[in-house]
């Protein structure tokens, strides 16, 4: 008998169709592209551009957007440290399922804490976890401020805002690092092409 978490008498039910068969059907390899960075660094912009470019190549992807998930799956969570940990854990579990289904899952979240991202990497399997660090300066992100959140944080209307009064821990060994150029975020297409080039080189866009 197996005991899982707080539940007892729970057993893992194997599927009659495995990941290998699903990948063969889709002619691609399931993986998780985990996009992390400050608010306003271009995470959602990259996620949307990447999904579009993959679709143009006949590859199936799905975006897990941090804000969108807080409308449903994670709507019961706030922004305290423990809630942020649980937020990332849940997204990691869902991303793992998408990758197992053979999809290219694009997770777009600030995910500020290194240990939480590393936990997702371990959960999903290192070889299928591609961490993309949007290495954009706080100054650039605050200047962009597409949602007006930095202005609210500076005014004291948002507490615990990443980059202002809560830390962001940069990745130490990410697969892809995208940097600003002359104080500007690279174009969406250019960023997407860099990620796609990595996926191609690592064999994720074909099933062999």
Spans of features found by a protein language model:
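Conserved substrate/cofactor phosphate-moiety recognition/catalytic segment
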Residues: 48-96
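Extreme N-terminal, non-catalytic leader segments
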Residues: 1-32
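Conserved beta-strand scaffold positions in the cores of enzyme catalytic domains, especially
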Residues: 63, 129-131, 175-177
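Hydrophobic anchor at the beta1->P-loop junction of P-loop NTPases
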Residues: 35
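Conserved lysine of the Walker
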Residues: 43
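ATP-dependent NMP and nucleoside kinases share a basic, alpha-helical "lid"
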Residues: 72-83, 93-154, 160
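Small-molecule kinase domains that catalyze NTP-dependent phosphoryl transfer to phosphate-bearing small molecules
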Residues: 135-193, 198, 202-208
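The conserved Walker
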Residues: 39
